[in-house]
């Protein structure tokens, strides 16, 4: 019965996306510089794990050298106000992959090893949408959307998977190939994870160079605890800084392969982070807050994207964009449309990436932790209201004018009650949609190793 239900769901989704794809040529990227017909663009999404806003050279780091990421910005676009949709890892990833607020999937906190919850089967992921448009799909690295069989990448549109089911600070540190544990990575072995993932990425793009592909590379660093190969360490230097530079060098090997294969002009490459810094060593560039908080330092992260001939080189935009915008952006870029059977919170941000066409947002950006709306940002991006929740606790709402005070140092709620009232009303509207469920924090009682690996059959 389960197989029949899954087959029916897949058939319905394929039909929905096929019809949408047929109609898309008339309307995708309306008013913008739509890529010409021809080969669908390859999509490479590269994620750092808890990288602070200023810890990339092109964002002003005085101590960290990142020529690979800087090169993406030089040859493409850099967003100065790109936001993640949640303050912690698991729901942040849900938002990107579904184009929806994480609470719609019932995930509003970090998933733990052997949690009974994970990414629901009825969510349509970016991988599924692109797969149904003819893409090969591969996930590499940190997943963190559930480690039980039904929640793994190969059940959510990815043809293959090599990576870790959760963060490096959660035991045991397991490496999974598709649906089975293939290794446990203590100490020195964990130091080689980044290189191993990039090796796999290079093999993947080489093997799939003649068809459109979606490569999802989710690095496990610079999330602590950090272990690096001896050759990547600098005596006396913070390991966090070495880790970011190591990630940059390893990612450079993938971009070199894409260039060598002649795929650069057919590939959009995005690099960003899932959250702000967890480590005190992370530099948010004067922005307040860290992971777990909806202050700017916890949710504003680096974002650079390259697509030669489509995204102008050297472009910089300060228009607010949020992670769930990337689902419709990339689906439209691939020639499809988002399904019409559910609420999508994101919108096509292609005009922001290219500087061509109109982009306006009608609704505020909203952050939700558990069943609390923690912050609201008005569509233009000036006013940000904090309501508490998550790691932040305070008695009264706080209002900040980000145009004048991006560091959120001066609460102006008492001077602008009209703005507080308007954004509070917006928060209440969202709160009506927030289900009274959220991720359960289960202890590690039956880790994957104890089951001899994970099977999807």
At which residue positions do the language-model features occur?
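Bacterial N-terminal signal peptides that target proteins for export
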Residues: 3-16
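Residue-level detector of intrinsically disordered terminal segments
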Residues: 1-3, 447
């Amino acid at each position: 019965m389960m197989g029949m239900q899954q087959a029916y769901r897949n058939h319905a989704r394929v039909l929905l996306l096929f019809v949408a794809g047929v109609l898309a040529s008339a309307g995708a990227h309306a008013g913008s510089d739509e890529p010409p017909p021809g080969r669908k663009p390859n999509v490479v999404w590269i994620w750092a794990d808890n990288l602070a806003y200023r810890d990339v050279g092109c964002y002003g780091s005085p101590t960290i050298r990142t020529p690979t990421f800087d090169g993406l910005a030089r040859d493409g676009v850099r967003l100065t106000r790109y936001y993640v949709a949640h303050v912690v890892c698991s729901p942040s990833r849900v938002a990107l992959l579904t184009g929806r607020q994480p609470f719609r999937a019932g995930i509003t906190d970090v998933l733990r090893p052997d949690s009974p919850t994970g990414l629901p089967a009825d969510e349509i992921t970016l991988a599924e949408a692109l797969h149904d448009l003819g893409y090969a799909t591969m996930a590499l690295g940190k997943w963190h959307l559930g480690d039980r069989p039904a929640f793994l990448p190969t059940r959510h549109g990815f043809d293959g998977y090599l990576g870790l089911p959760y963060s490096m600070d959660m035991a045991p540190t397991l490496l999974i190939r598709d649906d089975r544990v293939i290794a446990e990575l203590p100490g020195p072995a964990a130091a080689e994870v980044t290189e191993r993932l990039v090796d796999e990425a290079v093999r993947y793009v080489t093997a799939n160079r003649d068809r459109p592909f979606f490569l999802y590379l989710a690095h496990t660093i610079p999330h602590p605890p950090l272990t690096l190969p001896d050759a990547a360490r600098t005596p006396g230097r913070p390991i966090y800084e070495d880790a970011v530079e190591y990630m940059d060098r390893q990612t450079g090997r993938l971009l070199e392969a894409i260039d060598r294969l002649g795929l650069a002009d057919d590939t959009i490459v995005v690099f960003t982070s899932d959250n702000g810094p967890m480590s005190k060593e992370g530099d948010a560039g004067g922005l307040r807050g860290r992971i777990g908080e909806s202050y700017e330092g916890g949710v504003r992260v680096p974002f650079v994207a390259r697509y030669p001939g489509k995204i102008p080189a050297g472009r910089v935009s300060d228009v607010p964009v949020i992670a769930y915008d990337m689902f419709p952006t990339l689906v439209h870029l691939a020639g499809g449309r988002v399904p019409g059977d559910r609420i999508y919170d994101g919108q096509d941000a292609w005009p922001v990436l290219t500087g061509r066409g109109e982009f306006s947002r009608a609704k505020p950006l909203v952050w939700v932790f558990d069943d609390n709306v923690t912050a609201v940002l008005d569509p233009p991006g000036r006013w940000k209201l904090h309501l508490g929740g998550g790691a932040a606790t305070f008695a009264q709402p706080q209002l900040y004018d980000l145009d004048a005070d991006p560091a959120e140092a001066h609460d102006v709620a008492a001077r602008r009650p009209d703005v507080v009232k308007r954004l509070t009303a917006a928060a209440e509207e969202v709160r009506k949609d927030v289900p009274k469920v959220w991720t359960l924090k289960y202890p590690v009682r039956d880790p994957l190793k104890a089951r001899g690996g994970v099977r999807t059959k």
